[in-house]
Every structure is written in structure tokens, then in C-alpha cells.
Amino acid sequence: NDIEKSKIFYDNVLGVLGAKEGVFMPNLTGQTRYFYFLDKNTFCITEPIDGNEAHPGNGNTVAFNVPDEETGNKWHAVGLEHGGISIEENPGIREFENMKMYLAYLKDPSGNKICAIKIIK
């Protein structure tokens, strides 16, 4: 519910991944929105269009691809420096039955669950 605080957070964590500062693009009904462009992906933060308070999703996670563990660790550290909260296990490699991946989880300042991910082949 503090989009400017969220913008500062995402400017920094997505900056680690090469995104430029969020681009201000209000919608036609006046809500503030910021767009981030990452390679072939776009990420947006916005004030709720219905006028109600924003709430984090229950069971939702937005994942951002990282090229390696070092970048993921930096992404996580920068997130903590800008109001994020570390959740789940510490950043690192997790092994599953059919796959191995690097994961680093945070909650952003609004409580949304995000992670850095690298599939290891």
C-alpha cells in the first residue's frame, strides 16, 4: 500500500538483474504503476484498480531468473537492505527428485513472496 516504498525496493533488487529504474505509467483511471523491463520479461507494480487496499496473494510466488548463485545471493542481500524479509530456507541449492535448483526467497515490503531461481542442469 506504499507504492513508492515498493518502487525503491524493486528498483534495487531488479537492478541487480539488469533492470533500469521502474518506468512510471499511470493507468487511465489514475492509479500509479511502475514497469520494469528484464530481457524478454516485464514486471509491474501497481496501486489496486478497485480502490481497496493491496494484499499479498496466499500461495503465490513471483520468480526471477538469475544466471548464477552469486547473482542470486546479491539479489537476496540487496532485498534485505531495502526492506525485504528472508523467508523459507537460506539461499542455496535445493535438490528435488527430478531437478536441482538454486533458490533465494524474500517477502517484499508489502508482504509479497518473491524468489531468485536458477535451474541447474
Where are these regions (language model features)?
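Core segments of cupin and vicinal oxygen chelate
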Residues: 1-43
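Vicinal oxygen chelate
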Residues: 2-4, 63-109
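Short hydrophobic alpha-helix segments
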Residues: 25, 90-91, 117
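Long, continuous compositionally biased terminal/linker segments
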Residues: 32, 36-74, 81
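Active-site beta-strand termini and strand-to-loop segments that position acidic
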Residues: 34-40, 106-109, 119
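Glycine-rich acetyl-CoA-binding "A-motif" of GNAT/NAT acetyltransferases
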Residues: 41, 100, 113
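Conserved beta-strand in the GNAT
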Residues: 43-47, 105, 114-118
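A short acidic/small-residue loop/turn micro-motif
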Residues: 95-96, 119-121
